[in-house]
Curated annotation (Swiss-Prot):
SUPFAM superfamilies: Multidrug resistance efflux transporter EmrE (SSF103481). This is UPF0060 membrane protein YnfA. The lineage of its organism: Bacteria, Pseudomonadati, Pseudomonadota, Gammaproteobacteria, Enterobacterales. It comes from Salmonella typhi. Its main location: membrane. Residues 27-30, 82-84 are cytoplasmic. Belongs to the UPF0060 family. Coiled coil: none annotated. The keyword Lipoprotein does not apply. It is a multi-pass membrane protein. InterPro entries: UPF0060. Keywords: Cell inner membrane, Cell membrane, Membrane, Transmembrane, Transmembrane helix. One of its GO terms (cellular component) is plasma membrane.
Length: 108
């Protein structure tokens, strides 16, 4: 379970970075060269999703829970926004959903 969660976390970071760098280019006028590491990050994101031993749709559904938490961590650390009780509550619910799906992988 821990290995799966850590893999999802790294996967989420790759997806967020791969989307954040073009956002910097479009919204903040960063160099177009940031699109190269963005593309590499998104390619790594896709590859990491293939490392799970479940059907793709089930992996994407479970990954979503960790993505929500990682995005909120990004919101706090990178964007400097203080998390609310609603953020924390949503993250907890998302992680519970991920846990239920992952535990069920071996039972279907």
């Amino acid at each position: 379970m821990l290995k799966t969660t850590l893999l999802f976390f790294v996967t989420a970071l790759c997806e967020i970075i791969g989307c954040f760098l073009p956002w910097l280019w479009i919204k903040r006028g960063a160099s177009v060269w940031w699109l190269l590491p963005a593309a590499a990050s998104l390619a790594l994101f896709v590859w990491l999703l293939t490392l799970h031993p479940a059907a793709s749709g089930r992996v994407y559904a479970a990954y979503g829970g960790v993505y929500v938490c990682t995005a909120l961590l990004w919101l706090r650390v990178v964007d400097g926004v203080r998390l609310t009780v609603y953020d924390w509550s949503g993250a907890l619910i998302a992680l519970c959903g991920m846990l239920i799906i992952v535990v069920g992988w071996g039972r279907t």
